[in-house]
């Protein structure tokens, strides 16, 4: 089980590195430089797609209408992680590219930061410990206790969950952006996904189960 969880967690996959030959000064003019940067961008996108395809292979295939089945938001660590999960960031980038459905050049110009786009709902994300969660709902609908620490050969590691929730401001006052408030009422609601965690059921049985956490 530990091996399986490490595959699903942060920093366990072997991410290929990107190496380029030469630099911009050795290229023959701006056209070659542009082609070099475009090629590097295409290579980077290809690597991301391979990583996400590999992640999908190890995900369960059964769907659930109440929540996404799998999300890479769990990390085993001795201290609070300083950054969001890498696969979470890659998924966000991949979703953006899929939505754009255009060439790399047009995608770069359609960066939301350049167009001043805003999310439909405001949200906040943070790492949460099992001590803060305490309990969760598993795939069978039962409430289980989330264990704070996971035993490893050289000691124990804490379970951390990267949760995303709607901000109280967007939920309570403003509703969803892009909705005509003259005709429609809207509300930002936090949705959940399943992640694998070490838990204990009401019969004191400890095991790895899929539990729900807030993800958007």
Curated annotation (Swiss-Prot):
Entry keyword annotation includes Metal-binding: no
Keywords: Cleavage on pair of basic residues, Disulfide bond, Glycoprotein, Growth factor, Secreted
Propeptide: 1-108
The organism's place on the tree of life at top rank: Eukaryota
InterPro entries: Brain-der_neurotrophic_factor, Cystine-knot_cytokine, Nerve_growth_factor-like, Nerve_growth_factor-rel, Nerve_growth_factor_CS
Covalent S-S links between cysteines: 121-188
UniProt subcellular location: Secreted
Chief localization: secreted
Pfam family, one: NGF
Annotated GO MF terms: growth factor activity; nerve growth factor receptor binding
Glycosylation, residue list: 101
Transmembrane segments: none
Function according to Swiss-Prot or TrEMBL: Promotes the survival of neuronal populations that are all located either in the central nervous system or directly connected to it.
Family (UniProt): Belongs to the NGF-beta family.
Protein name (record): Neurotrophic factor BDNF precursor form
Native source species: Cylindrophis ruffus (Red-tailed pipe snake)
């Amino acid at each position: 089980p530990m091996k399986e969880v490490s595959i699903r967690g942060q920093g366990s996959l072997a991410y290929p590195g990107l190496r380029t030959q030469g630099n911009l000064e050795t290229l023959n003019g701006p056209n070659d430089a542009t082609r070099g940067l475009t090629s590097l961008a295409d290579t980077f996108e290809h690597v991301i797609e391979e990583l996400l395809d590999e992640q999908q292979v190890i995900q369960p295939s059964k769907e659930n209408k109440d929540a996404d089945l799998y999300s890479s938001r769990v990390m085993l660590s001795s201290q609070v992680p300083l950054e969001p999960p890498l696969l979470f960031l890659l998924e966000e980038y991949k979703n953006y590219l899929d939505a754009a459905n255009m060439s790399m050049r047009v995608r770069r110009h359609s960066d939301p930061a350049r167009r001043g786009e805003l999310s439909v709902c405001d949200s906040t994300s943070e790492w949460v410990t099992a001590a803060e969660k305490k309990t969760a709902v598993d795939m069978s609908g039962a409430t289980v206790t989330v264990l704070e620490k996971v035993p490893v050969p050289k000691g124990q590691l804490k379970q951390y969950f990267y949760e995303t929730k709607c901000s109280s401001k967007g939920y309570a006052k403003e509703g969803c952006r892009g909705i005509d408030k003259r005709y429609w009422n809207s509300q930002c609601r936090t949705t959940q996904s399943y992640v694998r965690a070490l838990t204990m059921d009401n019969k004191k049985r400890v095991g790895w189960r899929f539990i729900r956490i807030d993800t958007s």
